């Protein structure tokens, strides 16, 4: 029974990467869009809603697994949630390039070669509608 639960939860788990280099290489290798999510996991209410309503939905997770490489770029404020220094530096460098205005959440979509396709943020829509938004970029 426990094994079945472990397998079921791993199948529905969102595979979030935190390394840009790894995400870019995976997107290129698998010919998938790279979705970069700039978020403040412990202070940004719209970020938390996006996480809960879209990223954590079974529908989005199933679709993303087949079509996207997901990269989480977190900017926590609470000391207890602090990221390792190297992770912080990477996230800040990527924000300088892709999130110059400091919007949170910001969802940046790159093609499999790393070219910018577009960006969006939190929208009060269903997971299917959010998938359509990402695919329209």
Language model: regions and residue ranges:
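Bacterial Sec-dependent N-terminal signal peptides
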Residues: 1-15
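Thiol-based oxidoreductase modules, predominantly thioredoxin-like and allied folds used
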Residues: 16-17, 60-89
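A short beta-strand-turn-helix
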Residues: 17-34, 64
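Short active-site neighborhood of thiol/selenol oxidoreductases, capturing the structured segment around
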Residues: 30-44, 70
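Solvent-exposed loop/turn segments at secondary-structure junctions
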Residues: 41-44, 54, 75-79, 102, ...
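The canonical Cys-X-X-Cys-His
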Residues: 44-47, 107
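Non-catalytic, surface beta->alpha helical segment in thiol-disulfide oxidoreductase systems
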Residues: 96-97, 101-137
């Amino acid at each position: 029974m426990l094994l079945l639960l472990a397998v079921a939860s791993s199948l529905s788990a969102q595979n979030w990467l935190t390394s840009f280099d790894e995400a870019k290489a995976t997107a290129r290798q698998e010919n998938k869009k790279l979705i970069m999510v700039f978020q403040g996991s412990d202070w940004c209410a719209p970020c938390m809603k996006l996480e809960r309503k879209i990223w954590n939905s079974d529908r989005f997770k199933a679709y993303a697994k087949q079509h996207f490489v997901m990269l989480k770029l977190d900017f926590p404020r609470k000391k207890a949630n602090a990221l390792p220094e190297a992770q912080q530096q990477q996230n800040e460098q990527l924000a300088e390039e892709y999130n110059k205005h400091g919007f949170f959440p910001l969802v940046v979509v790159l093609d499999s070669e790393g070219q910018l396709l577009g960006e969006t943020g939190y929208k009060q829509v269903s997971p299917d509608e959010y998938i359509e938004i990402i695919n329209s970029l």
